[in-house]
Amino acid sequence: MAEKLTNEQQAAVDSRERSLLVSAAAGSGKTKVLVERLFSYVEREGANLDDFLIITYTRAAASELRGKIAKALTERMERDPGNYHLRQQMLRVYRADIKTVDAFCTALLRENCHLLGEDARGHALRPDFRVLDENEAQVLRERVLARTLDDFYDCLTPGGTLLADTLGAGRDDSALEDLVLELHAKLQAQPYEDKWLEAQRAFWRAVPDKIEDTPYGKILLNEVRRKARHCKNLLQRAAQEMCANDALNQKYAPAFLDASYQLEALEGKTAEGWDAARGVTIAFPRLAAVKDSDGGEMKARMKSLWDNCKETVKGFAEIFSASSDEAVEDLRTMASAMLALIDLTADFSRRYNEEKRRRNSADFSDQEHEAIRLLIGEDGAPTELSRIVSARYREIMVD
């Protein structure tokens, strides 16, 4: 007899007409809930197994999940051998869409790549396109990047010259190559590459007057705020714990509390801006001497905690090494170089894509981007193909 579901699991099985996230530890039964939810549709509502798109993260997981669904179906047929609808599912389980995102995108492209049209050089992706493995893609990227850099050096702009000089390019191109490939990797992670590139250009064309208004400043201030709060809480809890030890309470606890108050002040100042936070001084003096016999095991633990928080605060000094005006000036000085880097990466990306099209090949990122183009129009609305594909499925489940 199947193991009974918990109340929370049963609620996840029964929920309808809304998106649902099941979050739990590994091995707690999330896949089991998915299988039970799937069969709740089949048994209660007359659905078929191939009415659903079920996404997994690896091909092995997809195969394993199909096996679990087939096993669950067999168990149900044994309990109800006369159920014709269940017998039909034995045929459907092997044609149900249980696959990875990559496999889904590949199938979608092979069926509909004619809708993408040709690129600027007249190359179109054909249904028999080949998916490059990572080694092939890397070799091709390196070849295309070498040609791209040759043309970059032949037509250097002032920004390009600053970029090359800053990275020591010309003598050793490895730093520039690595930077272009790193930015290209980030570009490939964006659903709309051109829009992302234009957003980066817009930032560097008009750097804000305050560093806290830049993405970098916001990230750094949030990091300082989070770490200051964490260290403050650690020190305050430690001071409270040291009340149980007279020697530590007398020698260590006051310093812990003083540092925690300074960290609390820093946490508050991060909301006021860069320079306000930069102006907060936090002292971590040498702790007073405490005999091991008086401090016991707690002494070593508290000393370690103090040293860890002290190291964290040292990192704040590095972050706030420059004032807001100085940091903004540094960004503006590098703006032309950054714009040149963005344009260089965009040129490399275009050439790389054209070379893949010429070879009738695609990498994993291409499949996802082209699938988005097929399913979502330039205005952000679903395409006709999107509506057709959507109509195939009653629900999308992700394991």
PLM features: residue spans?
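Short amphipathic alpha-helical coiled-coil/interface segments
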Residues: 137, 141-145, 345, 349, ...
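ATP-hydrolysis module of ASCE/P-loop NTPase motor domains
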Residues: 90-97, 116-192, 308-311, 317-321
